[in-house]
């Protein structure tokens, strides 16, 4: 049943009454309430909107109702706030029609109508503005109608010009592949983020001879398989910062889940519930606090596959990584850490299946901790594990009888420990240096083919750098850590040679790709040119012969075109290639480049 006409008119814009006719504002009472309820039961009708009525808190008077009522939902509130400024652009009659939509409480239809009318009003206003601008340009006496016509012609001309440019570009180079090649060939080179690192290490002179296998570190790490990265964390080497990078700053298909308030993150393989990282921030101290190389190599396999049968254990690849630091800075940083109350009592020091006895590893303090310890007392303790800590944690302690100092003479023991630490460090999948954060990031990315999200930051100010020591104390610290000093010198030389070798290999690969790209582009341009020339000659051979008496003209034009293209590409290549090895020329072949690098090391020596 339809709603009475008087009820429908109540929600329509008020009409001007005829002269002399009375204005009816209310419905007659002859319509029963049952009829109104039946009319309101039909969905989507105006009666349903009438029955629903306006929202809560809104008056029933039309002329006293605001333009937009405050809706109850946040999304509707945002829509209303976005549509409210458009009411000012509408005429009075259109505003009244908008109120009909508002009474139905259909914000979607209201916003669509407002946007449509608003854009039309803005276009009309812009049209008049352009007309006013043209009137100022072409003469003050021009009429508004003529200016509107000129503005329309200008817009039409701009659109036609754009379409003409698109057609010409498509005709000159119809393939998208050709367009991409031209954009890559003539675009400005992408800045190299490691250019400053190359310049800083330009004066580096190698001291050790390493083979190509020692310098080339590229691990085929299968994160979806069974491979595992094991992080050997040495105290006060920046391992905490690097460990956070591993769980929070790597681009992965399935990133690690790190929750607020939890010390460990969940680093699962894609599609599995197994971890690919064995570190403090992923598995915790599963092998003891700051476990060394001797502990990790015997503990990690049993921890990872301890619950499985030996016959069902997969053949895993354990990729060990670590971070080293300058021995003097690391020693001072550890002293400051101990001075604040650190003890590392939870360290197990398990070697050959057992922890050391109190006679083998005495303590330097008698209380609960060593807080407030002065530097002299810290250096005077002969059992301080801070002395030569990096060599001890990277070597195989079973070769020297673990912590039993009576197995062999001290001099022989030190030599065995140092050689073992060098060998383990060289055969590790990766190691970085705290003093070279950006190079550490680069080598890790190239080694494991995993990219970090944000670059590493080099901090020049640390707690150790704030400690002022004289030359005598510094020499004593170097004497207490003489094994670490030699190991760090070896590690720094190997680290910088690896960086230079990987950078040189990367530049050679980029140069080879540019040469292949240039050859492909030359062939494509020549093919397009000769095809167009052949089509023109086949269509009108007599006219082409009369217009082109010299057949070598097209060939000279093609040669000039290719010469200019080659020159521009060569200039771009020269801008991109960095200055390496004191400006010495390098070969394009990868194997030849490797031999050149090894040969340059011999010349530097």
From Swiss-Prot:
Residues in the Cytoplasmic compartment per record: 1-4
Biased composition (Polar residues): 579-597
Residue numbers binding 3'-phosphoadenylyl sulfate: 233-241, 325, 333, 457-459, 463-464
Compartment list: Membrane
Cited SUPFAM superfamilies: P-loop containing nucleoside triphosphate hydrolases (SSF52540)
Biased composition (Basic and acidic residues): 9-18
One GO MF term: heparan sulfate 6-sulfotransferase activity
Annotated TM spans: 5-27
Disorder named in the UniProt entry: Paganini-Miozzo syndrome: An X-linked, syndromic, neurodevelopmental disorder characterized by intellectual disability, global developmental delay, severe myopia, and mild facial dysmorphism.
Family listed: Belongs to the sulfotransferase 6 family.
Function summary: 6-O-sulfation enzyme which catalyzes the transfer of sulfate from 3'-phosphoadenosine 5'-phosphosulfate (PAPS) to position 6 of the N-sulfoglucosamine residue (GlcNS) of heparan sulfate.
Name used for this protein in its record: Heparan-sulfate 6-O-sulfotransferase 2
Organism: Homo sapiens (Human)
Organism ancestry: Eukaryota, Metazoa, Chordata, Craniata, Vertebrata
Gene responsible for this protein: HS6ST2
